[in-house]
Curated annotation (Swiss-Prot):
Residues 85-129 are annotated as: Leucine-zipper. Residues 1-32, 194-249 are annotated as: Disordered. The keyword Cell cycle does not apply. Expressed in seedlings, roots, leaves, nodes, internodes, flowers and embryo. This is Homeobox-leucine zipper protein HOX6. It comes from Oryza sativa subsp. japonica.
């Protein structure tokens, strides 16, 4: 294709400079297109060397049957066309790179906007719990502290376990469990409620002068026995004589 284009626009003057009135030939005689063989030889030489020295031009012109001036003009025009095509190729490559960069820029711009929106949503989510639950946090802490002070167990100065209970009306009562229930163990005291008698502690033996009189029936005395292991009436005395007779004496 390049050879055909070159043959169309490269028409060299093969005749000499004649006078105005000289009838050597017309314009068609003075101009001649390059043949295909000449164009191929010139292009092969141009592929190896874009600019020829005067000696190389003369030798190539002799081989092709052309004038050195024709060879020089052909190489000059060919270099101009070659540079123009090279610039077009470079421009096309740069244009493609620019389009790719522009597309990448637009994609990154959209991604940036999406990330900004996502960041704003996360910031709103972080601020929402503070405004919604921040005021109630203090109330929960205060109510928890009051509930914790409802019922607490302390140890008195004398070593006896005491139960401290705070009433809602503001009054406080402190009672010593050892004074109230001497027959119950410490494991039976659960939040101020005495549910069952202790199986590990037995009541002390009756003191002299503090027993029941003989006028009281025995059935009434036996009704105060709390434990099944409480000794019977026969086991409380060393003989068969009831123990209240000794006390009455």
């Amino acid at each position: 294709m390049d050879g055909e284009e070159d043959s169309e626009w490269m028409m060299m003057d093969v005749g000499g400079k004649g006078g105005k009135g000289g009838g050597g030939g017309g314009a068609a005689d003075r101009k001649k297109r390059f043949s295909e063989e000449q164009i191929k030889s010139l292009e092969s030489m141009f592929a190896t060397q874009t600019k020829l020295e005067p000696r190389q031009k003369l030798q190539l012109a002799r081989e092709l049957g052309l004038q050195p001036r024709q060879v020089a003009i052909w190489f000059q025009n060919k270099r101009a066309r070659w540079k123009s095509k090279q610039l077009e190729r470079e421009y096309s490559a740069l244009r493609d790179d620019y389009d790719a960069l522009l597309c990448s820029y637009e994609s990154l711009k959209k991604e940036k906007l999406a990330l900004i929106k996502q960041l704003e949503k996360l910031a709103e989510m972080l601020q929402e719990p503070r405004g919604k639950y921040g005021d109630n946090a203090g109330d929960d802490a205060r109510s928890g502290g009051v509930a914790g002070m409802k019922k607490e167990e302390f140890v008195g100065a004398g070593g006896a376990a005491t139960l401290y209970s705070s009433a809602e009306g503001g009054g406080t009562t402190t009672t010593t469990t050892a004074k109230l229930m001497p027959h119950f163990g410490s494991d039976d005291v659960d939040a101020g409620l005495f549910l069952r008698p202790s199986s590990q502690h037995h009541p002390p033996p009756p003191h002299a002068g503090a027993g029941f009189t003989s006028s009281e029936p025995a059935a009434d005395h036996q009704s105060f026995n709390f434990h099944s292991s409480w000794p019977s009436s026969t086991e409380q005395t060393c003989s068969s004589t009831p123990w209240w007779e000794f006390e009455s004496e």
